[in-house]
Amino acid sequence: MFRLNKLTDYGIVLMAHVARSPEETPHTARSLANETKLPLPTVGKLLRQLSEHRLLSSHRGVNGGYNLAREARSITVAEIILALEGPIGFTECSVVKGLCNMEHSCAIMSNSQIIGDALRDALEHVTLSDLNHEMAHHERKHDQELVASIKPAGSVAEGVR
């Protein structure tokens, strides 16, 4: 199974959460931990890493906290993964040459490179704005389904009088 590690998943959740909030409101590690239900030490670690990679900007002081370093539409999922996991690739050898003893005789290396490039390209085309747009659409759909499932207070079940 190909998947992100848990910290990267949490990092994407944090970045999407920060992107949904007003830009002028800095987020503290504690407020983000409370709002996302993630452990405070994990949130602190992720905020530091994301700041070091200039995806978040940090502000010290009484009104300090974290904000996006750029607009949500210019931060890609690929950048977040790169900041938290390193280079994106399908296999280790498709990212760093010379790691595998079979590299020169490998029958699938070129295909691994093609898959890695396609994966990276796809992730470079999904932004925080895209993630939040999809989330807002899902929340609206859920709300509409919930409203549709509620029967009016004056309705009588069929066959009961």
Model-derived features: positions:
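Short coil turns linking two alpha-helices in DNA-binding domains
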Residues: P39-T42
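Beta-hairpin "wing" of winged helix-turn-helix
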Residues: R54-A69
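Conserved segment of winged-helix/HTH DNA-binding domains
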Residues: A72-K97, I108-A118
